[in-house]
Amino acid sequence: VRISERFSLEATQFELDFVDIDTDYDTPLFVDPFFLGCRTDLWSLNATRTLRSFFQTFVNFIRDDERRRARALFNYLHEPNETCLGLSRGKPRGNAIGSIDSEKLFNSIAQSKAVATGIVEDLEDFRLFIDGIDKDKISDMTTNIIRGHLVTYTQEQCKLWGIALQQNVQSGFYWERAANEWRNRHESMLVIEGRKILLVPKGIVSYSNKYTPQKYYNQFVLEYLQHEHLRNYSALVQHRVNGMPYVTKKSLKESGESAYSKDFLATFTDAHPEVFRDFKEWIQHTATAISNEELDDSDPAIIAQYLIRKLGQIAAGGEGATRYHRLVVGILEFLFYPDVVSPIVENEIHDGRKRVDITFDNAARGGFFYRLHTTYQTPAQFIFVECKNYSREVANPEIDQLSGRFSMNLGKFGLLLCRTVDDMDTLLARCNDTYVDGRGIMLPIIDDDLIVMLNKVIEGVPNPYEEFLSQRFRAVALN
């Protein structure tokens, strides 16, 4: 049973920021530290810092020949069972670093020349150079290390969707980077049928089919060697009918000196680190977050139609406020992912003196939300969202309320969502006053605007919010 069904969220995977796991069976997805490291939102940055803190501490112990201390850290990288992700068949039970192969795996890492020589720079590099480590083990190591961040994320998502938590439950060990040690704490946890569950942001999971030793070997190492053999006119050089020389990848694979193995990759990388750098840069520039369609085979057009119907069924006024808030979160998640992620509801700022309805993290690597920083010179680490399920007109107090959330450190961009307005020109003029005064950018969005963007999805237009937000910003700035 999926989380959305178990708790009657009335939301599809497209509307949820987390992977909508089936708690009875593992989903064959993996927490991907490379994707995590590529993301620019605050949650991911903090989780990546924690991951790198553990990695550096662990690897330094090995390089300094302090194997006992390294082994003590490694002991905590057991089989996590809380995420319901991975390769297990049947009920989730973990399928990675068990007691049987733990010692063998640790010895492989400790004795690896890739670790000793410094070729291994990040946790995900273990997969490229060390036998016995693949995507499932990397995913499970990462889950253990960032467990504290996943606990907090789960709490926020449960608060957002009204899912009850159990109090005073042991979190499980996580890496505390401030203290450089493993810690365990009592927390409010999601517990289902007696088992702790951690929700995972969908933007940090993948099928782990890109950052692989095979891809590095076939697309970078062998292509480099092809050029080298041609340059040196080696015995592997053949000629086409027109006399053009060439070297096949097959001949390189069959030659003893460049046959595939992780040891060979480590030796090659030590001699040619620039090729490894090129591989990492290529992955970073071509990697994209997993799409909703990869997680759920539902038709986005049907989801958009469903959201339009739901929006029309919620009456304006206080009674429908919570339903409206949650629907808005779902619609914005559906429209903006993966550029805007990790929604938090009723977030307190300024020591609780002010509250904002919803806060998203800005994770954009291009497009409108990225241009806020680069082109519009507006800090936008967070996207503030105020939802007003009013039947009356939105006026200056609501605008002042949202702009009062803005600061250089938190961001100066927000969306003001309301059901309808009688005079959009006046509302845009009020937002222009805020913009001209240097207090930030505020864009009003009404039901009809959401419906326009959702209809664009139905028509097959990619990222329909790009055109809408750009035009709405222009209407505010040039009013």
What spans do the regions from the language model cover?
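Catalytic core segments in nucleotide and nucleic-acid processing enzymes
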Residues: I303-N479
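Generic alpha-helix signal with a bias toward terminal, lower-confidence helices
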Residues: D41-W43, L150, Q157, Q166, ...
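Short hydrophobic/aromatic-rich motifs at helix boundaries and adjacent loops
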Residues: I119-L123, P300-I303, T374-T375
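Terminal, charged accessory segments of proteins
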Residues: V1-L252
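Charged/polar, solvent-exposed surface patches and flexible loops
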Residues: R49, S53, T57-N60, N75, ...
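The feature marks a conserved, polyanion-engaging helical scaffold used by nucleic-acid processing enzymes
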Residues: W175-I344, I349-G352
